[in-house]
A protein has these predicted regions:
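Conserved ATP-binding N-box helix of the HATPase_c
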Residues: 1-20, 24, 71-78, 155
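Short beta-strand-loop-beta element adjacent to the nucleotide/active-site pocket used for signaling
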Residues: 23-32
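GHKL-type ATPase core
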Residues: 31, 45, 56-197, 204, ...
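Acidic ATP/Mg2+-coordinating residue in the GHKL
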Residues: 36
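A short glycine-centered beta->alpha linker in the GHKL/HATPase_c
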Residues: 40-42
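GHKL/Bergerat-fold ATPase module
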Residues: 174-200, 229-232, 241, 327-421
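Charge-rich (often acidic), low-complexity intrinsically disordered regions concentrated
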Residues: 206-207, 221-225, 252-256, 262, ...
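Helix-hairpin-helix
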Residues: 210, 214-237
């Protein structure tokens, strides 16, 4: 729901502001209230947003926070399955010159994949935004890495332009202040690259295109695809490119994709990728971690798998509140992100973890990495993040991705090494000065004796 609120606000040019309240009403029974300052949802679309699973378009090849097509509807379903209670939504939105407000209570019809309205009420709205209230059972609140608090904390580092106020079940109120006042540039939709599509993708294009021939369907649906390249595919596969797309078979789609693998294409355009930016990452890390040292960078766009563009962003923070506290001791912390969204599960199998663990940290002045007050930040930006599983919480260890993460992090590690060396040198200098200060009275006294003069005051 946080990512949905961010996306809606940014599309409207609004700096996101979210209020979250998690109230415990019994053991493993909670009420969640989530409200934002976005543009609101028109009444006709409220139940579509909250009650339709996989409502997004399969072929929007655009960098997005959303991962699974579940989002808010998944939350509504879980609430309904564990408590039987309906969702309650208040939406305030602009319709022409009028500011409208509607209160709705509804449930999800799972079989029909749509909402069932139970109650609705108009009311005078004062501002735009959405508030949703859900109940959950058989869940627990935790301060662990996979818990709500940690998710919000990490979200703020990847989204420093937002403000989130969170009241936890104990009544404690956390205010995560905005560290940047710039609404991010919206990413542009780009055509898929031939090296990044599957046979299923090609078949989907064929069944949903308005083009009349394979040739025009391929040139209009894929980047870096010209009539000349289509003619090459026709020669290599023997498939008639003047056939109707709706008649395409799985075997033909598979043959076309296998042909793509043998061909060379220009790298895809990278103007559809919008990174957070090193300056914004630094602001976010400083706001949350308050470190003694910080360094960030954004790498140039490159490709993996022969044709999928991606950008790696990295940050390293040392000292202050960096790292995580375990048994009252600060240990190292790895923060993994994909398109600004924290990945809090399946850390061990992730390419980001693999890349960071493969670095020899002793070379950079960190003798015991696991027990050092350091936080590592890595964000992968792509229209097609290569997740390892359907859970979409860990990134596949593609060689190009692992290489980029290592290069980015080692560049920052060298800067940290300089800081640690300077810190060590300053400490040694201070120790030498202290030794001199301790012996100074003795030296003065002995010098006075040699000069047969009185000891100066």
């Amino acid at each position: 729901m946080i990512t949905n609120s961010f996306d809606a606000a940014e599309e409207a040019g609004i700096l996101p502001e979210i209020n979250i309240e998690l109230k415990r009403i019994d053991k493993e029974h909670y009420i969640l209230r989530h409200s934002d300052n976005g543009p609101g949802i028109p009444e006709d679309f409220v139940m579509q947003v909250y009650c339709s699973m996989f409502a997004g378009s399969k072929f929007r090849n655009i960098q997005s926070r959303g991962q699974q097509g579940l989002g808010c509807s998944g939350c509504v379903l879980l609430s309904q399955m564990t408590t039987g209670e309906p969702a309650r939504v208040i939406s305030c939105y602009q319709e022409g010159d009028d500011l409208k407000g509607v209160k709705m209570k509804f449930k999800m019809d799972v079989k029909k994949n749509k909402g069932m309205l139970m109650e609705r009420e108009d009311f005078p709205a004062e501002h735009t935004g959405v508030c949703i209230e859900l109940q959950f059972k058989d869940v627990s609140y935790s301060m662990a890495e996979q818990g709500a608090f940690e998710y919000i904390r990490r979200t703020m580092i990847g989204n420093p332009h937002a403000k989130i106020t969170f009241r936890d079940p104990t009544g404690h109120k956390y205010i995560f202040k905005r560290a940047a006042n710039i609404v991010p540039i919206l990413p542009k939709e780009v055509l898929p690259h031939p090296k990044g599509v599957s046979a299923d993708d090609i078949l989907f294009m064929a069944k949903h295109t308005d083009k009349r021939r394979y040739k025009s369907m391929l040139t209009s649906s894929l980047s870096r695809m010209s009539n000349k390249r289509v003619n090459e595919i026709e020669e290599l596969t023997g498939i008639d490119m003047n056939k109707r797309p709706k008649d395409m078979t799985w075997a033909e789609a598979e043959a076309i994709v296998n042909c793509f693998k043998k061909m060379k294409f220009m790298a895809p355009p990278s103007n559809g990728l919008i990174p957070i930016g090193s300056e914004q990452i630094e602001k976010g890390m400083k706001q949350i971690l308050k470190p003694e040292f910080i360094a960030t960078l954004t790498r140039k766009p490159v490709t993996y798998g022969g044709g999928v563009s991606f950008i790696i962003e990295a940050g390293i923070a040392y000292g202050g509140d960096s790292g995580r506290v375990v048994n009252e001791q600060r240990k190292s912390e790895i923060m993994r992100f994909a398109n600004r969204v924290p990945l809090t599960f399946d850390q061990g199998s992730c390419a980001i973890t693999e890349a960071l663990k493969s670095i020899d940290w002793k070379r950079y002045g960190i003798k015991d990495f696991d027990n050092s007050p350091v936080t590592l930040f890595v964000n992968i930006i792509s229209t097609q993040v290569p997740y390892l599983s359907t859970g979409k919480q860990s990134v596949s260890p593609e060689p190009e991705i692992v290489h980029e993460i290592r290069q980015a992090t080692m560049t920052l590690a060298r800067k940290l090494q300089k800081h640690l060396r300077a810190k060590k040198a300053a400490k040694e200098k201070a120790m030498r000065s202290k030794v001199f200060e301790d012996y100074l009275p003795v030296i003065i006294e002995e010098a006075a004796k040699l000069g047969e003069t009185a000891v100066p005051e």
